[in-house]
């Protein structure tokens, strides 16, 4: 679920940036998404959005699905092995790892999405 996803982000980035900093970034980080991603981090969010969309097509509710995971050496690892729990956990873990690798550019936080995300 979204709280677990936030915790995964903290795991992967070693707590260097609050999870909420990703909630309004670029064209895809946060609710919805459109246009061309503004950078590598925004692309991570686009991939995550697409993963959640695929989960929805499988009959899952990714923003609400509780799963089992652990943080080992700043790497989120899924314990859930089947069904929606496994699928959603994999979406979140991949995104958290992607976020940790991508540069965070403050100028892409809280952008005017109407102008920049066409």
From Swiss-Prot:
Write down the required cofactor(s).
Ca(2+)
InterPro entries referenced in this protein's UniProt entry, alphabetically: PLipase_A2, PLipase_A2_Asp_AS, PLipase_A2_dom, PLipase_A2_dom_sf, PLipase_A2_His_AS
Keyword annotations of the record: Calcium, Disulfide bond, Hydrolase, Lipid degradation, Lipid metabolism, Metal-binding, Secreted
GO biological process entries? arachidonate secretion; lipid catabolic process; phospholipid metabolic process
Q: List the disulfide bonds.
A: 11-71, 27-117, 29-45, 44-98, 51-91, 60-84, 78-89
EC numbers, comma separated = 3.1.1.4
Q: Where in the cell is it found?
A: Secreted
Question: Where are the active-site residues found?
Answer: 48, 92
Any Pfam family:
Phospholip_A2_1
Q: Which SUPFAM superfamilies match?
A: Phospholipase A2, PLA2
Expression by tissue, per the entry, reads: Expressed by the venom gland.
Q: How is the cofactor bound?
A: Binds 1 Ca(2+) ion.
Annotated catalysed reactions = a 1,2-diacyl-sn-glycero-3-phosphocholine + H2O = a 1-acyl-sn-glycero-3-phosphocholine + a fatty acid + H(+)
Which enzyme class? hydrolase
Q: Which GO terms describe its cellular component?
A: extracellular region
Q: Which residues bind Ca(2+)?
A: 28, 30, 32, 49
Checking PROSITE patterns in the record gives: PA2_ASP, PA2_HIS
Query: Its family?
Result: Belongs to the phospholipase A2 family. Group I subfamily. D49 sub-subfamily.
Query: Which PANTHER family has this protein been placed in?
Result: PHOSPHOLIPASE A2, PHOSPHOLIPASE A2 FAMILY MEMBER
Its biological purpose = PLA2 catalyzes the calcium-dependent hydrolysis of the 2-acyl groups in 3-sn-phosphoglycerides.
This protein is called Basic phospholipase A2 PA-12A
